[in-house]
Amino acid sequence: MSDMRRREFIALLAGTAATWPRLLSAQPRLPRVGILWHAANEEEEAIYLGAVRRGLSDFGYVEGKNIILENRFPAEIPERFISLAADLAAIKVDILVAINRIAALAAQRATTTIPIIFVAVPDPVGAKLVASLAHPGGNITGLSNFATDLTAKRIELLKEIVPSMSHVALLVNPNDKDTSRVYTEEAQRAVKKLEITLYPVEVRSPSDLEPAFLKMRDRPVDGLAVSQDGLFDATRKNIADLALNHRLPTAVYSRETVDAGALASYGPSNYGIFRRSGYYIDKILKGAKPSKFPVEQPAKFEFIVNLKTAKALGLEVPPTLLARADEVIE
C-alpha cells in the first residue's frame, strides 16, 4: 500500500471512529418497567410473569428487544418490599408495576413522579392508593381483583360439595391486616347464614403453612377456604398438597391452585388480570396519565372443579354443581 493510500485509510478509520459515540448515543433508549413481585424468585412467579409478557406481546413488546423488565422479588418480607421499591425508583424506571397491596403501598412511598400500575389489589380506594376507581388522581392506577363476598361464595360452594361440613377454616395473611379483616367479615356472614363455625387461621409466610395445617388437624375442621392473597398464590402447590395430605376439601381463589390440586376455585382469572397489565403499560408508555386512567375491576368470575381431587378425597360433586362449573378438571 502506498504512503498516500495508507494515509487515506488511516484518515477514514479516524473519521469513522469519531462518529461511533454519536451513533451509539443515537440508539433509541428502551423503556424500562420495574415489577415488584411478592414471591422469592422468578420460578415462583413463572405463570404470572408469563402472563405479563403475553400481555406486552399483545401490543408488540418483546422483552430485551424493545422493552426491559426489571423484576424484583421480596420473598414476602415486608421490609424488602420497601427497599426494593426504593431501588426501582432510584434507577428511574419508566413505570413501576406493583403486584399486590403491600407492593403498591411500598411503590407509593418510593415515588410520587414515576407512574405506578398496581395489579391484583383488592381495595385500592380503602388502601388510599387512589382517590376513586374512576378518577385515581396522583401517579397511580391499575387493576383490582376484588369483588364483594367472593370469600362467602367459596364457603357456600364448599358446603354444597361437602353438605356435612360444620367447621370451616379460613386462611388469611395478617401482613395485610385491612384486607384480611374484610375477608374474615365476609366469611363470618357466610357461616352465620349456613349455621356452621368459622376458624380463621393466620399465615404470614410460607414457613407458617405446615404448622397451620397441623392446627386445623387438631380442631374439628372439615373444610378450608383460602382468601385471595399473593402469599397463597405463590405457595399454591404447597397448599394443595397439604390440603390433600390432611384430606381437607379446599376452596381457593385462583384456578392455578386448582390446577395444582386444590378441590375448587371461585374468582376472577388471575392470569387474565396479569395479562391485562400489558394494556396499562402500553397506554402509559404512550403518554396516558395514571391520574385520569380508571382502575379496572374484574367483570368475569370462574368456577373450577377438580374431580381428580374430589375422587381422592372420597367426595361426589353434585351434578347440578358440575353443570354450573366453567371448567371441570378430570
PLM features: residue spans?
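Short hydrophobic alpha-helices and adjacent helix-cap/hinge residues
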Residues: 1-330
